[in-house]
Structure formats: C-alpha cells, structure tokens
UniProtKB/Swiss-Prot annotation:
Belongs to the glutaminase PdxT/SNO family. One of its GO terms (biological process) is pyridoxal phosphate biosynthetic process. The gene is pdxT. One of its GO terms (molecular function) is pyridoxal 5'-phosphate synthase (glutamine hydrolysing) activity. Catalyzes the hydrolysis of glutamine to glutamate and ammonia as part of the biosynthesis of pyridoxal 5'-phosphate. The resulting ammonia molecule is channeled to the active site of PdxS. Its EC number is 4.3.3.6, 3.5.1.2. Keywords: Glutamine amidotransferase, Hydrolase, Lyase, Pyridoxal phosphate. The lineage of its organism: Archaea, Thermoproteota, Thermoprotei, Thermoproteales, Thermoproteaceae. InterPro entries: Class_I_gatase-like, PdxT/SNO. GO terms for cellular component: cytosol; glutaminase complex. This is Pyridoxal 5'-phosphate synthase subunit PdxT. It comes from the Archaea.
Amino acid sequence: MKIGILALQGDVEEHRYALEKAAAELGLSVKVVEVKNAQDLADISTLILTGGESTTIGKLAKAKGLEDNIKKATLPILATCAGLIYLAKEAVDRRVGKTRQSLLGLLDVSVVRNAFGRQRESFQTELEVRGFGKVNAVFIRAPAVVKIGPSVEPLASLRHVDYGEVYAAVRQGSVLATAFHPELTTTAFHKWLIREAKR
C-alpha cells in the first residue's frame, strides 16, 4: 500500500512518522511516498495534505501541475491545519478578509485562516472527536471551520470568542480534515487513512 504526503512545505516528517507508527500498530506495511509533482500521484492509495502555510502550498501545487491532478484523483484524503484550508471551498483570513489563494474546493466548508491568532496564541486542549474519542489536540496558527455544507459531518467543535461554535474536525465521505495537528499526539487519524486505503 502506497500513501502519499504532499511534500511541498510543512510537517512532512511528522506525518511520515505517524503513518509508519500507525501501520505498525495495525500490523501492516505501508510505503510512504513524498508527492512533489504530478507523477508522484500515480499508484498511491491515499493522500495527506500537511500543515504549513496554505498560500505557499497552493502556489507550489499549481506551479508543479499537482492541483488539477489532485482534484481528478478522488483519493481518500487526510488534511491537517493548512491542508484543511487548501482543501476547502472557501477561505478568508481573520485579519485581511477575502484572499485570492488557490483552493482545491474538494471539501464543502468555509474556513477562517489564523482564526485562533498567530504563533504565540497556539494552544493544546482535549477534544472529543466523533469516531476517535478523546484527542489531545494541538492548534498552531490554526484555522476554524465556520460553515459546513449538507454533505459534511462535523466531528469536533469548540467555542471561539468571535465566531461562536466552530468545527475543529470534519468529514465528507472519504475526506477527513482537522484544524489541529493529530500527527503530533496520536496515530488514530492515520489509522483511519490506512483503513480507507484498504477499502
């Protein structure tokens, strides 16, 4: 089984480690492929969109011809933090409002970038995530999902001082996205991705 990690920017190694650990815990073997161009998408079973900086990820993916190929691939996807933003149908920035950044539009959600503030406002909290139980969630310059479409299932929410209840984890079919970084604290989400790949 080959699992791809979009490796243009962000926490690629943390996801690789979480994937390999998750596979070992399941008694399975996975090959992790760093996806840096369209050819790297061939033969992968699933894809991870990492955290990092969503505008940079989008620009690089477009420049390398990855964006259209990811849209066409219909792969199970795990997206975290900036990956969630890049996957969204709509994104605005907390400070500057509308942005012209490139988005995949594969997840029917509206996202506010940097919703919880900048780096110094990063935090950790315990969240109850439907289907995953209690998760130690690390939010780093985290986005927030403020609106979901009818086909999107909310998995975890928390209160935001400006936006009220916001979503920190959502699922739409075989696409799972989190505003936090599960790769830093748990293998549960990577196990989900491996199981999706086996379907």
